[in-house]
Curated annotation (Swiss-Prot):
The keyword Cell division does not apply. One of its GO terms (cellular component) is cytosol. Homodimer. SUPFAM superfamilies: Class II aaRS ABD-related (SSF52954), Class II aaRS and biotin synthetases (SSF55681), YbaK/ProRS associated domain (SSF55826). Consists of three domains: the N-terminal catalytic domain, the editing domain and the C-terminal anticodon-binding domain. CDD domains: ProRS-INS, ProRS_anticodon_short, ProRS_core_prok. NCBIfam families: PRK09194.1, proS_fam_II. The keyword Protein biosynthesis applies. It catalyses: tRNA(Pro) + L-proline + ATP = L-prolyl-tRNA(Pro) + AMP + diphosphate. Coiled coil: none annotated. InterPro entries: aa-tRNA-synt_IIb, aa-tRNA-synth_II, aa-tRNA-synth_II/BPL/LPL, Anticodon-bd, Anticodon-bd_dom_sf, Pro-tRNA-ligase_IIa, Pro-tRNA-synth_IIa_bac-type, Pro-tRNA-Synthase_IIa_type1. This is Proline--tRNA ligase. It is found in: Cytoplasm.
C-alpha cells in the first residue's frame, strides 16, 4: 500500500482530551477519529489490525467447534422485557421507537436474541451441545465515555453462546472456551490474567474475566505472587485467620466518646488501635435490616456480601433507619445486646483479642467486649475487601494488586435466560427441559487498545508481529532521487510478491518526517532506502529492539521471511 494515497493522517500534538496512551497514539498515528463522544471512525490502519485480531479469534473458536453467524443489532423490546433486563439495564440500554411506535433496543449483548432463535430452531437433545458466535458492533449509552476505545458508546465485540443438556456438558464447553481465550490473548501479544469475577447483570453463577495488565486499567486485579490464584477486587479472597486459643476480655466497660463519629475518632478517644474497634454497618439485605461487623481498618465488599449471603439486593440503611432500630446514630452502633437483628461478622473478627465497639447509645462505646458473652453472631462471612499483602487463599504466597483492562469474560448462565424466555428442548425421555447456557465475550476494539497500552514507547506504537497492520514500513527517503525511487519501487514489488504486507512511504516529505511517522505507526520492521541506494544497500531497523543493520537489496526478502517467522 502506497502511503501517498493511504488514509492515515498522522498528528504531531497530543489531543488535549485524550487521557489514555492508546487513545493518544491511535489518534496521532491516524488510526481513528472521533465522530461524537464515545463514537469513533476506524481508519484503514485500525481496520487492518482489527481484521487480524478477528482472524485469530475465528481460528481459535472454529478449532473448538463453534459456528459463526450474524444476529441483528435491532432488538424488539419484548425479548428484553421477558428476561427482565429492559428495566434492569437502565439508561445504558439504547432505546428507540419505530414509525409504528414499537419499542426496540440497540443490542449491547445478545442473550435474549440468541435464546429466542435457538428456542425456535432446536427441539431435541440430539442437536446438543451447540456453540455459536458472532463479531459485531454493540451499543451502550455510557454516562461518561472516556479512554478512547476502552469505554465507548459503540464498540466491536465477539460474543458466543453455548447450549447444553447437562451441567457436565456446560462445564466442558466453559473450560474449552477458557483455553481458547488464553490462546487468543497470548497470540495477540497481551500480558493478561484470567480472574474470578462477579456475573453482575448478566446473571448465572461461575464466571472469569480476562484482564490485560495496564496502568490505565479501571479494574484492580488481585493475584498471588506464589501461585496462579487471581480474582478481581470485587471477588478476591484472602486466607482466613484462626481464632486465638485463649480470649481474655475483662469486664465490659462503657466509656463516653462524645466527639467520635468515625472508627479513627473512636480509636483516638479510647486509646485503641483502629483495627481493634468494630466497624458496625447497618445494612438492608433483601429488605431485612441487618448488622455487619468488620475490623476497623477493613472495608465492606458489597459484591462479596451479596454472594456470601445468597442475596439479591443490598443497601446501606439510612440514618433514620439506624436510629429507629438501634436508638443511636451510626458512629455509636455495635452488636452488644442486639437481639432481633441478624448479625453477620467478617471472619477477621474471630482473631480479635482486644475489642471495642459502639454502645448503641450516641456518644458512647464499650471496651473489653467478649464474643458469646456480650453478643452472638448469626453467621461469620467473608465480607471485607482484601488488602495488598494479605495471605493468598490457597496458602501460597501473598496477594498483590495490579491495574487491568477487562478484555473478555466467560459465564455459566445456567437456565437464567432459557427459563425467562421459555426456551426448552426434549430430553431422552421426551420431557421438556430448559437449555443450560454459557456466554462468552471478547471486546475486540478493547483488545486493540489494550495491545497499544502494553506495546508502546516514547516514540509511538510498537506492534506485536501477529496484529501489526503491516509487517514492513518501506521508506523512500528522497523520492526526487532517481536511484532511491527506483530501488524503493523494486523492493516494494519484491516484498509484495513474497506475500508480506508492506506500507510504502512514497510521499514527498523530508526524511525526518518519515522516520517520525514510521516510529509513531510502529510497524515491526522499517526499511529505509537512502543515500546508498546506488550501491544497492538499504538500512533495516527492528522497531521493538532498535536493532539496525545494512543489507543488500537482494538479501532483504529472505531476511524478512526469517524475521517474521521467529
Amino acid at each position: 500500500m502506497r502511503q501517498s494515497t493511504y488514509l492515515a493522517p498522522t498528528m504531531r500534538d497530543v489531543p488535549a482530551d485524550a487521557e489514555a496512551i492508546s487513545h493518544q497514539l491511535m489518534l496521532r498515528a491516524g488510526m481513528m477519529r472521533q465522530i461524537a463522544a464515545g463514537v469513533y471512525a476506524y481508519l484503514p490502519l485500525a481496520k487492518r489490525t482489527i481484521a487480524k485480531i478477528e482472524a485469530i479469534i475465528r481460528e481459535e473458536l472454529d478449532a473448538i467447534g463453534a459456528q459463526e453467524l450474524t444476529l441483528p443489532s435491532l432488538h424488539p423490546a419484548e425479548l428484553w422485557q421477558a428476561s427482565g433486563r429492559w428495566e434492569a439495564m437502565g439508561d445504558e440500554l439504547v432505546r428507540l421507537k419505530d414509525r409504528h411506535n414499537r419499542d426496540f433496543a440497540l443490542g449491547p449483548t445478545h442473550e435474549e436474541v440468541i435464546t429466542s432463535l435457538i428456542k425456535d430452531g432446536i427441539a431435541s437433545y440430539k442437536k446438543l451441545p451447540l456453540c455459536v458466535y458472532q463479531v459485531q458492533t454493540k451499543f451502550r449509552d455510557e454516562r461518561r465515555p472516556r479512554f478512547g476505545l476502552l469505554r465507548g458508546r459503540e464498540f466491536i465485540m465477539k460474543d458466543a453462546y453455548s447450549f447444553h443438556d447437562s451441567p457436565e456438558s456446560l462445564d466442558e464447553a466453559y473450560w474449552q472456551m477458557h483455553g481458547a481465550y488464553s490462546r487468543i490473548f497470548t497470540r495477540v501479544g497481551l500480558e493478561f490474567r484470567p480472574v474470578i469475577a462477579d456475573s453482575g447483570a448478566m446473571g448465572g453463577k461461575d464466571t472469569h474475566e480476562f484482564m490485560a495488565l495496564a496502568s490505565v486499567g479501571e479494574d484492580t486485579v488481585v493475584y498471588s505472587d506464589g501461585s496462579d490464584y487471581a480474582a478481581n477486587l470485587e471477588m478476591a479472597k484472602a486466607a482466613l485467620p484462626e481464632a486465638p486459643s485463649v480470649q481474655a476480655h475483662g469486664l465490659l466497660e462503657k466509656r463516653a466518646t462524645p466527639e467520635a463519629k468515625t472508627v479513627d475518632e473512636a480509636a483516638e478517644a479510647l486509646g485503641f488501635d483502629a483495627d481493634d474497634i468494630f466497624k458496625a454497618l447497618v445494612v438492608v439485605v433483601d429488605d431485612v435490616l441487618s448488622l455487619f461487623i468488620l475490623r476497623g481498618n477493613d472495608e465492606l465488599n458489597e459484591v462479596k456480601a451479596l454472594h456470601e449471603l445468597g442475596a439479591k439486593t443490598l443497601r446501606m440503611a439510612s440514618e433514620e433507619e439506624v436510629v429507629a432500630a438501634f436508638g443511636a446514630t451510626p458512629g455509636s452502633i455495635g452488636p452488644v445486646g442486639v437481639k432481633d437483628v441478624p448479625i453477620y461478622a467478617d471472619y477477621r473478627i474471630r482473631s480479635m483479642e482486644r475489642i471495642a465497639c459502639g454502645a448503641n447509645e450516641t456518644g458512647y462505646h464499650y471496651v473489653n467486649v467478649g464474643p458469646g458473652r456480650d453478643y452472638e453472631v448469626t453467621a461469620y462471612k467473608d465480607l471485607r475487601t482484601v488488602r495488598e499483602g494479605d495471605p493468598s487463599p490457597d496458602g501460597k504466597g501473598t496477594l498483590r494488586f495490579a491495574e487491568g483492562i477487562e478484555i473478555g469474560q466467560i459465564f455459566k448462565l445456567g437456565t437464567r435466560y432459557s427459563e425467562s424466555l421459555d426456551a426448552k428442548y426434549l430430553d431422552g425421555q421426551g420431557k421438556a427441559q430448559p437449555f443450560l447456557m454459557g456466554c462468552y465475550g471478547i471486546g475486540v476494539s478493547r483488545t486493540l487498545a489494550a495491545v497499544i497500552e502494553q506495546h508502546h514507547d516514547e516514540a509511538g506504537i510498537v506492534w506485536p508481529k501477529a496484529v501489526a497492520p503491516f509487517d514492513v514500513h518501506l521508506l523512500a527517503l528522497n523520492v526526487k532521487n532517481e536511484d532511491q525511487k527506483t530501488l524503493a519501487e523494486q523492493l516494494y514489488s519484491d516484498i509484495r510478491q513474497a506475500g508480506i504486507d508492506v506500507l510504502y512511504d512514497d510521499r514527498p516529505e523530508r526524511a525526518g518526517v518519515k522516520f517520525k511517522d514510521a516510529d509513531l505507526i510502529g510497524l515491526p520492521v522499517r526499511v529505509a532506502v537512502g543515500k546508498r541506494a546506488g550501491e544497492g544497500i538499504i538500512e533495516v531497523k527492528v522497531r521493538k529492539t532498535g536493532e539496525q543493520l545494512e543489507l543488500t537489496a537482494s538479501e532483504l526478502v529472505r531476511w524478512l521471511n526469517d524475521f517474521l517467522r521467529e
